[in-house]
């Protein structure tokens, strides 16, 4: 293979340029030309296929900066319709005209789903990225746990019930994804900063973090030492939450709560999806979980509690919300993300050169080897209907009574943040939380 294309698709993450850099470095070593396709899958719909030569004469172009967030190539949320064979044939012809023999797609579970029809026509592989850390499997047979419902009504949806209450962390397929560690650093720093406002004004802060339906970002926000963490994998127990908030507020005169944007109530309804809208990829927009939770606390706790303490005139005055927002997705990636993103970009090049197709580079972890790159056939991620689902945080990672990471969850996080840049994360904070549990 002499010429490869690479594109970045889906939401931006801090480590995308590092992935591109890793692919360029490996392509240079193998004397393979690397063409960057501009604006993700969208480039494939353009007759010109906008592109840039990333390694002329097998040297990096200076614009590639692995320490810079975002993506030099641009991204989109467009995907290829697997049933549109005319468009797929046209895309294949366009890439052939550029003499591109294989394609690397940098993305998450949506991109892995989207590359399937391309892989049926020419070699295509995935280099992983997502701040949500929801690309992968908790254990190899996890796709078999999905069930499809609603066929009779026409409202088809998928549900899953974990078959294992415990599992070995070494079984995880794609232990962690580049972009996640940086997003955790930003979230934890936001929690720490908002704490001082809550302390100063005797208030209750609800901080919303990203992650969609997976609780990994909220879980690791424990590095910022919130009092309570709420994750989507465990439906909200409002009465328990109110009791816990009252207990903490009585003790220390302030409370900091981290709430995942995909949080659900006891009936399974998403708190942040009260207004139905979708993003360009068709995903339901989750925005407002923290506000919905604040309204519930205001109603349940009432004004008299705060007036009795003489700390606020009303519950509405005492309880406030903040979103960490898109700062989790942007900015300079920390060293852990830069290093392993580059390794995975290089692995994707190797996969194509070695003749693989419809495969994903992954970052694995074991007690004996630590972190190391590997790969899996993309079909390993698919359920019986051929669909790839976002990975949920395993319920065993969270203690629903204490409303914080469980010992298993802490064991999961430690390898990541022990190896992350010590200038960006404070590993000792997790030990403090463990001692308090």
Where does each model-flagged region fall?
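Accessory alpha-helical/coil subdomains and C-terminal extensions
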Residues: 34, 102-107, 113-117, 123-125, ...
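Short glycine/serine/threonine-rich phosphate/pyrophosphate-binding segments
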Residues: 13-23, 44-45, 81-89, 106-116, ...
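Short glycine-rich or small-residue beta-strand-to-loop segments that form or flank ligand, phosphate
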Residues: 3-11, 71-76, 101-106, 204-208, ...
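Short, ordered loop/turn segments at secondary-structure junctions
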Residues: 9-12, 37-43, 77-78, 108-111, ...
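C-terminal non-catalytic interaction/assembly regions of soluble proteins
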Residues: 273-437
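Glycine-rich oxoanion-binding loops at beta->alpha junctions
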Residues: 46-103, 131, 143-171, 176-192
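N-terminal phosphate-binding or glycine-rich loops at protein starts, especially the Walker A/P-loop
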Residues: 1-49
């Amino acid at each position: 293979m002499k010429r490869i294309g690479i594109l970045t698709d889906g939401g931006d993450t801090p480590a995308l340029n590092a992935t591109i850099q890793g692919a360029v470095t490996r392509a240079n070593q193998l004397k393979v030309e690397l063409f960057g396709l501009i604006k993700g899958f969208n480039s494939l719909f353009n007759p010109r296929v906008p592109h840039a030569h990333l390694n002329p004469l097998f040297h990096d172009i200076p614009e590639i900066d692995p320490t810079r967030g975002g993506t030099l190539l641009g991204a989109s949320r467009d995907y290829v319709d697997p049933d549109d064979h005319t468009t797929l044939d046209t895309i294949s012809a366009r890439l052939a005209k550029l003499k591109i023999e294989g394609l690397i797609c940098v993305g998450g579970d949506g991109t892995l789903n989207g590359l399937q029809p391309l892989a049926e026509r020419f070699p295509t592989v995935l280099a992983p990225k997502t701040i949500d850390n929801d690309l992968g499997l908790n254990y190899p047979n996890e796709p078999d746990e999905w069930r499809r419902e609603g066929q009779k009504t026409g409202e088809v949806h998928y549900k899953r019930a974990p078959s294992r209450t415990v599992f070995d962390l070494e079984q995880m397929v794609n232990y962690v994804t580049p972009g996640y560690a940086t997003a955790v650093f930003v979230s934890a720093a936001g929690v720490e900063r908002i704490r001082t406002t809550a302390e100063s004004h005797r208030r209750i802060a609800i901080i919303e973090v990203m992650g969609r339906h997976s609780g990994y970002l909220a879980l690791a926000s424990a590095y910022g030492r919130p009092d309570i963490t709420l994750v989507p994998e465990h439906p909200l127990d409002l009465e328990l939450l109110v009791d816990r908030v009252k207990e903490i507020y009585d003790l220390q005169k302030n409370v900091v709560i981290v709430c995942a944007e995909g949080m659900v109530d006891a009936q399974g309804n998403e708190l942040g999806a009260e207004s139905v809208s979708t993003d360009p990829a068709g995903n339901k927009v989750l925005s407002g979980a923290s506000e919905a939770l604040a309204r519930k606390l205001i109603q349940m706790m009432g004004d008299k509690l705060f007036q009795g303490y003489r700390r606020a005139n009303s519950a509405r005055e005492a309880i406030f919300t903040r979103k960490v927002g898109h700062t989790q997705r942007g900015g300079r990636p920390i060293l852990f993300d830069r290093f392993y993103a580059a390794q995975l970009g290089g692995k994707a090049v190797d996969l194509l050169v070695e003749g693989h197709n419809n495969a994903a580079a992954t970052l694995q972890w074991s007690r004996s080897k630590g972190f190391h790159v590997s790969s899996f056939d993309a079909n390993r991620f698919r359920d019986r209907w051929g669909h790839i689902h976002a990975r949920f945080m395993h319920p065993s990672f969270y203690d629903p009574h204490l409303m914080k990471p469980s010992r298993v969850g802490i064991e999961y996080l430690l390898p990541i943040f022990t190896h992350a840049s010590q200038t960006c994360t404070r590993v000792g904070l997790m030990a403090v939380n463990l001692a308090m549990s």
